[in-house]
Amino acid sequence: MIDLHNIRNEYSQQALSEKQCDDDPLKQLEKWLNEAIQAKVNEPTAMNVATVGENGKPSSRVVLLKEVNERGLVFFTNYHSHKGRDLAVNPFAAVNLFWAELQRQVRVEGRVERISPQASDEYFASRPYTSRIGAWASEQSAVISGKNSLLTKAALIAAKHPLQVPRPPHWGGYIVIPELIEFWQGRPSRLHDRIRYRLEKGEWVRERLSP
């Protein structure tokens, strides 16, 4: 058995004060995201999305954050996937971004909605050709007989669409509309900085939490 008890890091890079935080948590998220990109953090847009299905059981997976706007956080996926089925019956999610190199994480909770078909079309058209083919070939989360069947299907779709690939109707974007956003900065002695924003009567309330 692997001994994990003594695997730990001491956090000491930066501090996070209320004065440093923007009044708008989405702008604060953009600021931290930009700093992660500038620091060349590995996969700075990778975020864990947790959902809960009708059976009450949670599931989570890492997806790529593709946009932060005034409403929330946007990601794209197959609507028939496990997360898509979860969101169809329980349209809420918890999201986490972790930037180990900066000793930071951001936690988001909120309602999830599909974005407009037009916005999904626009993003889909920007994807590499092979990724667009893959969106048609993959019945995400479905059991398949083997890898060859997937590759054969992709080849058939590529032959059918050698140039332009339309967006599959079952593929598109979601937006997580935050009700809570927490910013975490690792600090010495595990006395971390935690600044939480929560939505109250349409206004953001900012508060410090005990680590």
From Swiss-Prot:
Its EC number is 1.4.3.5. InterPro entries: Pyridox_Oxase, Pyridox_Oxase_CS, Pyridox_Oxase_N, Pyridoxamine_oxidase_dimer_C, Split_barrel_FMN-bd. One of its GO terms (molecular function) is FMN binding. Keywords: Flavoprotein, FMN, Oxidoreductase, Pyridoxine biosynthesis. Binds 1 FMN per subunit. Pathway: Cofactor metabolism; pyridoxal 5'-phosphate salvage; pyridoxal 5'-phosphate from pyridoxamine 5'-phosphate: step 1/1; Cofactor metabolism; pyridoxal 5'-phosphate salvage; pyridoxal 5'-phosphate from pyridoxine 5'-phosphate: step 1/1. The keyword Oxidoreductase applies. Its cofactor is FMN. It catalyses: pyridoxamine 5'-phosphate + O2 + H2O = pyridoxal 5'-phosphate + H2O2 + NH4(+); pyridoxine 5'-phosphate + O2 = pyridoxal 5'-phosphate + H2O2. SUPFAM superfamilies: FMN-binding split barrel. FMN binds at residues 61-66, 76-77, 83, 105, 140-141, 184, 194. Belongs to the pyridoxamine 5'-phosphate oxidase family. This is Pyridoxine/pyridoxamine 5'-phosphate oxidase.
